[in-house]
Amino acid sequence: MNADWIAACVIAAMCATAAGCARAETMDRLAERYVKLVLAVGQHDPDYVDAYYGPQEWRKEAQASKRAVSDIDRDAADLLKQVAARAPGEGAEELVQLRHAYLTRQLEALRARVAMLQGTRLRFDEESKALYDVVAPTHTAADFEKVLGEIDRALPRRSGSQASEASLVERYDEFRKEFVIPPDRLDRVFKAAIDGCRSRTLEHIQLPPGESFTVEYVTKKSWSAYNWYQGNYRSIIQVNTDLPIYIDRAIDLACHEGYPGHHVYNALLEKHLMRDRGWQEFSVYALFSPQSLIAEGTANFGVDVAFPRPERLAFEEKVLFPAAGLDPSRASRYYDVLALVEQLVYAGNEAARRYLNGEIDAQAAADWLEKYGLYSRPRAEQRVRFMDQYRSYVINYNLGKDMVAAYVAARGGTPDQSSWRWDVFEDLLSSPRLPSGLIVNH
């Protein structure tokens, strides 16, 4: 049988029609242009390119040319038109449709970030919509005061005049002191947490062979931890030790940054989209883009998927508290209080919204975080520095988690359906879905 005829049959089967094949090839060329534009923006914004593992000559080209921001914007506008002209036809595979929508929205966010680099100032909600495809709900102080009252009643009171005058955040800090991981035990606790997160993830998700990450301990950062994805299924995870690290952060960070969070998310995208399909746009991660809400939302929700509350408490009591030299009998009490404090997570969004809109200054933003988020003063000041650097990115953690949780639950991934919950979660991790595509209409 003629080899050329066989090859033609294979190509026809893959493309279905000549037009479909041409469209796919054209989208690949457009995706390459997108990657190069992201790398070009990175020459003007050091935080913009969060990860890149495509051809190194493209990075070198971006560094050598250092294109003007106005040129980048003009090319991005043209690329958007080219992408719009190549919308997939009716009946196209869902992933192909998602790819087209993803590339469109990522380019729109790139243009918004470029406009900001050129001096455009957006209000908080305008910025989050432009960059992350969503707007966070607004809350008032009254929304948090009821929870603060519950926390006030839950925290112990000590005798003495000074104790009676202590503020709620001071009492919360005092309560938490016994749950700090001693610095000399930090590494062993994190390794134990990582092992637990990884083993639970591997029970449900087949990871690419050779995947791994290393942990580094750093200081003088505005964030508490960071995953630097290197490509080839490898990550570097940095943990900031500027401030005391509490025992609950071990699982939170191990899951969020590692398994089944950022490390798994990036590895699955690399395997299923970049390598298996050749979609080069997934070789680069633009931080200020809709992809980040998916990344942060799945990373935060992944903690609950890997460790539902009863299982987490058992693991803490049996493994992590002893590894940290803490009293396991106090674990349940600690997590009861944390469950209340978690209801204050949107207080951070309000501080950021008011601060970035120019309604309050940095000191007032830290005051708000102390009063309504129960941040210690050093941690509140660190968070304001994070707002200075990353701005409306803060919504991706809490709103992102809630949106991912609702999306997974709407597809039957409820806590009582653990195996299916993992399946829905893995599908989300492996697909180019947009934040607006997560919205559940009741």
Predicted regions and their residues:
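N-terminal secretory signal peptides that target proteins for export/translocation
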Residues: M1-D4
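N-terminal maturation segment of proteins
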Residues: A22-H442
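Bacterial N-terminal signal peptides
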Residues: A7-T17
